[in-house]
Swiss-Prot record:
<keyword id="KW-0796">Tight junction</keyword>
<dbReference type="GO" id="GO:0005912">
    <property type="term" value="C:adherens junction"/>
</dbReference>
<feature type="compositionally biased region" description="Low complexity">
    <location>
        <begin position="182"/>
        <end position="194"/>
    </location>
</feature>
<comment type="similarity">
    <text>Belongs to the CCDC85 family.</text>
</comment>
<protein>
    <recommendedName>
        <fullName>Coiled-coil domain-containing protein 85C</fullName>
    </recommendedName>
</protein>
<keyword id="KW-0965">Cell junction</keyword>
<keyword id="KW-0175">Coiled coil</keyword>
<dbReference type="GO" id="GO:0005923">
    <property type="term" value="C:bicellular tight junction"/>
</dbReference>
<dbReference type="Pfam" id="PF10226">
    <property type="entry name" value="CCDC85"/>
</dbReference>
<feature type="coiled-coil region">
    <location>
        <begin position="116"/>
        <end position="146"/>
    </location>
</feature>
<dbReference type="GO" id="GO:0043296">
    <property type="term" value="C:apical junction complex"/>
</dbReference>
<feature type="compositionally biased region" description="Polar residues">
    <location>
        <begin position="157"/>
        <end position="172"/>
    </location>
</feature>
<feature type="coiled-coil region">
    <location>
        <begin position="26"/>
        <end position="86"/>
    </location>
</feature>
<dbReference type="InterPro" id="IPR019359">
    <property type="entry name" value="CCDC85"/>
</dbReference>
<comment type="function">
    <text>May play a role in cell-cell adhesion and epithelium development. May play an important role in cortical development, especially in the maintenance of radial glia.</text>
</comment>
<keyword id="KW-0217">Developmental protein</keyword>
<feature type="region of interest" description="Disordered">
    <location>
        <begin position="153"/>
        <end position="237"/>
    </location>
</feature>
């Protein structure tokens, strides 16, 4: 509005010509001049206010600019941190990519090696399965053989008793018929008409079979351990079964030895009745120097001894344990013949007689087996120093 008044006054003055101004009076000119001065002062005040307003706005804008600068600086700092973090993450990504490539190569190589090893192990597994099948077949065959041998040993018509009787028959074929009651090893343990034949026939056959089994097992066990070789292909179960059989045979042999010792020490009358004097004192007096038992129950013949030994006796290293026991039994028998009166013969029962005869059968079967396996013992027995029952 002031601008409008000032413009209107300027237009009024500028529109007035000089002639008209000269015509005006002093009072009118002073009024016009003061009016113009007032208008100028108002315009100046208005301009000052406007400048203050502008300055205030400028200050506000400056404060805003400073705040924006601070925000911008913070954003720049954050941007720098993010840039550095991006660089770090990019490095990690590169490392991870490189590591993943290496792991891929390692995985492919490992898979190849594993497949090769699996193929090799599958081949070995097939071979082991084939070997296991062959071992199972061999074990079954060996078990059948062992069972057959065990049945043959424990059977009533075992080969051991037959062989022992045949060997004794061949050795003593020239001897005359023996008396029935003298403890001879006949198959019927006496004649068919003897009074104790029918009473003890079944018991004596069972005892003979057991004695034949013990004799056969003793011959098998008398071989040194390095001569007994286990076949290749026997597994632990078969070996354990064989060892159990050997242990059982040893126990039976020990029982037989204990029975013999008990009969020798506690039943002297039975021994006297069961054995007959086939040997003179002169023959038995030359035997004790050779009656030393062996350590392992087996005969080891040295080349020098076997080549230079006379035919009339058996060296110590050649005498089996059965021969030694038989000599001891015969010596006890001779002593009984000299010491015990004949009145004790009446005290023996039929059962005691059968037991004594069976013990004699066992002893002479062992002598026959030893003579069949050792030529020197066969020669010694054929020299009429020991004549067992047929």
């Amino acid at each position: 509005m002031a601008k409008h008044c000032q413009g209107a006054a300027a237009e009024d003055i500028s529109a007035v010509s000089d002639e008209e101004l000269l015509r005006w009076s002093k009072e009118e000119l002073i009024k016009r001049l003061r009016k113009v001065d007032n208008e100028k002062m108002s315009l100046m005040l208005e301009h000052g206010n406007m400048m203050k307003d502008v300055n205030r706005r400028l200050q506000l804008h400056l404060h805003e600019i400073r705040g924006l600068k601070d925000v911008n600086q913070k954003l720049q700092d954050e941007s720098q941190e993010l840039r550095e973090l991006c660089c770090f993450l990019d490095d990690d990504r590169q490392k991870g990519k490189k590591l993943s490539r290496e792991w891929q190569r390692f995985g492919r190589h490992s898979a190849t090696v594993v497949w090769k090893e699996v193929g090799t192990y599958q081949q070995k597994l097939k071979e082991l399965e084939a070997k296991q099948e062959s071992l199972v077949r061999d074990n079954l065959e060996l078990k059948e053989i062992i069972l057959m041998l065990d049945e043959e040993r424990n059977g009533p018509g075992s080969r051991s008793s037959i062989d022992s009787q045949n060997s004794l028959t061949n050795l003593n074929g020239g001897s005359g018929p023996r008396d029935v009651g003298d403890g001879s090893s006949t198959s019927s343990t006496g004649s068919a008409g003897s009074p104790d034949h029918h009473h003890h026939h079944h018991h004596i056959k069972t005892t003979e079979n057991k004695a034949g089994t013990i004799r056969k097992s003793t011959d098998d066990l008398s071989v040194p351990p390095h001569h007994r070789s286990i076949p290749n292909g026997l597994n632990d179960s078969s070996t354990t079964y064989i060892r159990q059989l050997e242990t059982r045979v040893k126990l039976l042999e020990d029982d037989n030895k204990l029975l013999s010792q008990h009969s020798t020490s506690g039943e002297l009358r039975t021994l006297r009745k069961g054995l007959s004097p086939y040997h003179s004192e002169s023959q038995l007096s030359s035997l004790p120097q050779y009656q030393e038992p062996l350590q392992n129950g087996s005969a080891r013949v040295a080349p020098e001894v076997s080549s230079t030994a006379p035919a009339g006796y058996i060296p110590v290293v050649q005498k089996p344990e059965a021969v030694v026991h038989a000599m001891k039994v015969l010596e006890v028998h001779e002593n009984l013949d000299r010491q015990i009166p004949d009145t004790y013969e009446e005290d023996l029962s039929e059962k005691e007689k059968a037991i004594v005869r069976e013990m004699c059968n066992v002893v002479w079967r062992k002598l026959g087996d030893a003579a069949n396996s050792k030529p020197s013992i066969r020669q010694h027995l054929s020299g009429n120093q020991f004549k067992g029952p047929l």
